[in-house]
């Protein structure tokens, strides 16, 4: 359906560019009216054919009681460090304590910086 709309608009633009010096205002108005009628009829058809479904899908795995995905809690999380070869297991309470303390600052080692001085 989108291709149809793009095609109609493209044809309209091509006709407008192809005949700019001719007095075709009446033809352009008729063409515009027909384009708008076509677009309105297709959009009305699409809206009429769409009927929203209020009933849940009839799937055996659908459970209405478990809709909140944020209830899942994990007892441990895995943190992978770039410096170590393996993974460290850190308890979630430790992560919560670290994120709750906003007073402490974390310092990361920076790469060696080289300063160049230019003499003029």
Swiss-Prot record:
A single Gene Ontology CC annotation of this entry is: extracellular region
> Chief subcellular site?
secreted
Q: Which UniProt keywords apply?
A: Secreted, Signal
The keyword Signal belongs to this UniProt entry's keyword annotation: yes
Q: List the disulfide bonds.
A: none
Range of residues in the leader sequence: 1-18
Does the record's keyword annotation contain Secreted?
yes
As for subcellular location, the record says: Secreted
What is the protein name for this chain? Answer: Kidney androgen-regulated protein
Gene that encodes it: Kap
């Amino acid at each position: 359906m989108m291709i149809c709309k793009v095609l109609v608009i493209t044809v309209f633009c091509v006709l407008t560019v192809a005949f700019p010096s001719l007095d075709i205002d009446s033809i352009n108005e008729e063409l515009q009216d027909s384009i708008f009628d076509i677009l309105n009829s297709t959009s009305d058809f699409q809206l009429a054919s769409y009927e929203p479904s209020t009933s849940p899908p009839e799937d055996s795995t659908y459970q209405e009681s478990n809709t909140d995905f944020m209830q899942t809690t994990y007892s441990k999380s895995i943190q992978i460090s770039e410096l170590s070869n393996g993974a460290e297991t850190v308890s979630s309470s430790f992560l919560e304590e670290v994120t709750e303390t906003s007073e402490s600052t974390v310092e990361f080692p920076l790469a060696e910086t080289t300063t160049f001085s230019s003499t003029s």
